[in-house]
Amino acid sequence: MTALYSVIKFKIIELIKSGKYQANDQLPTESEFCEQYDVSRTTVRLALQQLELEGYIKRIQGKGTFVSAAKIQTPIPHKITSFAEQMRGLRSESKVLELVVIPADHSIAELLKMKENEPVNKLVRVRYAEGEPLQYHTSYIPWKAAPGLAQEECTGSLFELLRTKYNIEISRGTESIEPILTDETISGHLLTNVGAPAFLSESLTYDKNEEVVEYAQIITRGDRTKFTVEQSYHS
């Protein structure tokens, strides 16, 4: 038997999808929903909590509950693509938070197939879609592969920069994705509540000589993202 709060949740989702409630519209109050659906406040509160966790609505203290903007559909590509390409025509940009050279610790050295304490470029960026922070992106690039990286060069495609400045031809990559909850630092940069749902992507990128040229950790807002996969069938 379906829980009553789930029924209310799906009713509200249908109203959002039908256009009755549009992005940034204020929703009725809890008591108004109680009267509308003839249910208890606890039921309505549970439904709204689920809608917030799933990214359909957002609560602003002292103002009320509002419909969130539509989620950005991000394809899981079969080839390596830039952030701008993944945004499929949305206005995208990057802000560099940090670019430093650090000694590789044990875990970074293993991932980049180098010796401990060898120099590594650490690049931290926030990626924006339509002016809204979407990703917190940390890249580790062997210094010997890309010496002299400049901060002003790193606001566009990193792989294009590696190709044009350092003659590095990207060949392939591996990527894993798992759900996480944001901590205080990530939430501050992505403008979410602490403990908000997000996706952690970890990737390794190789050049044509099978050298690792980047290890990346990308944290993507869960309330603003929907991943899609295109599949084919062969009998």
From Swiss-Prot:
Entry keyword annotation includes Nucleus: no
Pfam family, one: UTRA
DNA-binding interval(s): 30-49
GO BP annotations listed: negative regulation of DNA-templated transcription
Disruption phenotype: Deletion of the gene improves the growth rate on N-acetylglucosamine.
Keywords per UniProt: DNA-binding, Repressor, Transcription, Transcription regulation
Description of how activity is regulated: Binding to DNA is allosterically inhibited by the effector glucosamine-6-phosphate (GlcN6P). N-acetylglucosamine-6-phosphate (GlcNAc6P) and glucose-6-phosphate (Glc6P) have no effect.
Coiled-coil stretches noted in the UniProt entry, renumbered to this chain: none
Record-level Gene Ontology MF annotations: DNA binding; DNA-binding transcription factor activity
Occurrences of domain HTH gntR-type (ranges): 2-70
Gene induction: Expression is increased by growth on glucosamine.
Annotated signal sequence range: none
PROSITE patterns reported for this sequence: HTH_GNTR
InterPro entries recorded: Bact_HTH_transcr_reg, Chorismate_lyase_/UTRA_dom_sf, Tscrpt_reg_HTH_GntR, UTRA, WH-like_DNA-bd_sf, WH_DNA-bd_sf
Function: Transcriptional repressor of genes involved in glucosamine transport and utilization. Represses the expression of the gamAP operon by binding to the gamA-gamR intergenic region.
Protein known as: HTH-type transcriptional repressor GamR
Organism (species): Bacillus subtilis (strain 168)
